[in-house]
Amino acid sequence: MEELIGVEIEEKGEVVVATLTGELDISVAETTGRRIADAVPSSARGVVVDMSALEFMDSSGVSMLFSLARQVGSHRQELRVVAPPGRPVARVLEIVEFGRAAPVHEDLDSAVGEMATPQA
């Protein structure tokens, strides 16, 4: 069976970037969230989930993001999400007001840049 979702994880300094491609639905949401959370070392400032190339996300994907925000927050780390305007995923995040749980950025550079900059 073909994998619905692609997950690429890399470290950019003190920030972990998880790039998702394909479809994030109930069949892969739980394992995807666990894989991302497990990839964030305690020394990291947090994680950026890049959803720029994600084609589809259902409510289980939204739930996974809220859970991930709580989980990294409990370790005093940050979650940021990349969802460019005009993409279906960006609209879903807007509807559920995900920005109240974690910042949503238009591009990866701004998400990583803001997280890498110490807050006063």
Model segments located where?
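Conserved catalytic submotifs in the C-terminal HATPase_c
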Residues: K12-G13, S52, D109
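Glycine-centered tight turns that cap/initiate beta-strands
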Residues: E14, F98-A101, D107
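Amphipathic alpha-helical interaction surfaces in cytosolic regulatory modules
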Residues: I26-A102
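General small-molecule cofactor/ligand-binding pocket signal
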Residues: E10, V82, H105
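Generic N-terminal initiation segments characterized by hydrophobic and/or small/turn-forming residues
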Residues: M1, V17, T21, M51, ...
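Short, solvent-exposed coil/turn elements at secondary-structure transition points
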Residues: E23, P85, L108-S110
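STAS-typified acidic loop motif
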Residues: E3-R34
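A charged, well-structured terminal subsegment
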Residues: V104-A120
